[in-house]
Amino acid sequence: MANTVKISSCELINADCLEFIRTLPENSVDLIVTDPPYFKVKPEGWDNQWKGDDDYLQWLDQCLAQFWRVLKPAGSLYLFCGHRLASDTELMMRERFNVLNHIIWAKPSGRWNGCNKESLRAYFPATERILFAEHYQGSYQLKSDGYAA
């Protein structure tokens, strides 16, 4: 069941992504901003519903396929992703989208602030990644950097 809020000409929909997006027509969305579960980051059940990384990435790839289907040719995608699977996520995105940039959000009051940093065995992430992409328009052409080889 979807919860819908209308603000002026915008409609915000809170629903299961894969269920709802399948109801949308092709090339009908200008912008997708999504913050899917990161898998094994939070203790809640919704973030741990997959059997392993491969299972999670298969689910995310299904989402990406639907994003590509509904996104207009000049549309944009902003996908928030956790640090652990950011590389895998980007590689999957590049199969369908032209990844334009990585946005690194430095979180001033992230959960790392209250942790015992001395007891950690790795650096605790103080940032969040956002992958910015556009609809794939054909075979990828490496852009010239303007320098002669």
Region annotations inferred by a language model:
Residues 2-149:
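Core catalytic lobe of class I
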